[in-house]
UniProtKB/Swiss-Prot annotation:
GO CC annotation terms, alphabetical: ribosome; small ribosomal subunit
HAMAP family from the UniProt entry: Ribosomal_uS12_B
PROSITE patterns registered for this protein in UniProt: RIBOSOMAL_S12
Xref: Pfam families: Ribosom_S12_S23 (PF00164)
Modified residues (3-methylthioaspartic acid): D89
Job description of the protein: With S4 and S5 plays an important role in translational accuracy. Interacts with and stabilizes bases of the 16S rRNA that are involved in tRNA selection in the A site and with the mRNA backbone. Located at the interface of the 30S and 50S subunits, it traverses the body of the 30S subunit contacting proteins on the other side and probably holding the rRNA structure together. The combined cluster of proteins S8, S12 and S17 appears to hold together the shoulder and platform of the 30S subunit.
InterPro entries named in the record: NA-bd_OB-fold, Ribosomal_uS12, Ribosomal_uS12_bac
Protein name per Swiss-Prot or TrEMBL: Small ribosomal subunit protein uS12
Keywords (A to Z) from UniProt: Methylation, Ribonucleoprotein, Ribosomal protein, RNA-binding, rRNA-binding, tRNA-binding
Comp. bias (Basic residues): 9-20
Region: Disordered, residue numbers: 1-32
Length: 124
């Protein structure tokens, strides 16, 4: 516990808030190039093959990003847009790829929650 005179001399230091998505550098999204597309297996109670991609961002940082939705067209050297948002059962995956922008196609035959998967409105 500091004394009053110590507080007058130095003051209190503001605690810096750590960001959950540092690679975005406080931008809403970032563009990047896929360096590798692969599958990960999730943590203990779950079982699946989750689709992920290593992405080299315009900032020069390389991150692992999740590819949401069923099926995708991503390959190496594709240009993608990523946003923040972790995947709870994949350790180290803190970013999502935005579907329906740049080289990423939207999910076809998607009826509900279309805006999250870049799907066009189906013709009646």
């Amino acid at each position: 516990m500091p004394t009053i005179s110590q507080l007058i001399r130095h003051g209190r230091q503001k605690q810096k808030k750590r960001t959950k998505s540092p690679a975005l550098k406080s931008s809403p999204q970032r563009r990047g190039v896929c360096t590798r597309v692969m599958t990960f297996t999730p943590k203990k109670p779950n079982s699946a093959l989750r689709k992920v991609a290593r992405v080299r961002l315009t900032t020069g940082i390389e991150v692992t990003a999740y590819i949401p939705g069923e099926g995708h067209n991503l390959q190496e050297h594709n240009v993608v847009l990523i946003r923040g948002g972790r995947v709870k059962d994949l350790p180290g995956v803190r970013y999502h790829i935005i579907r329906g922008t740049l080289d990423t196609l939207g999910v076809d035959k998607r009826r509900n929650g279309r805006s999250k998967y870049g799907a066009k409105r189906p013709k009646a």
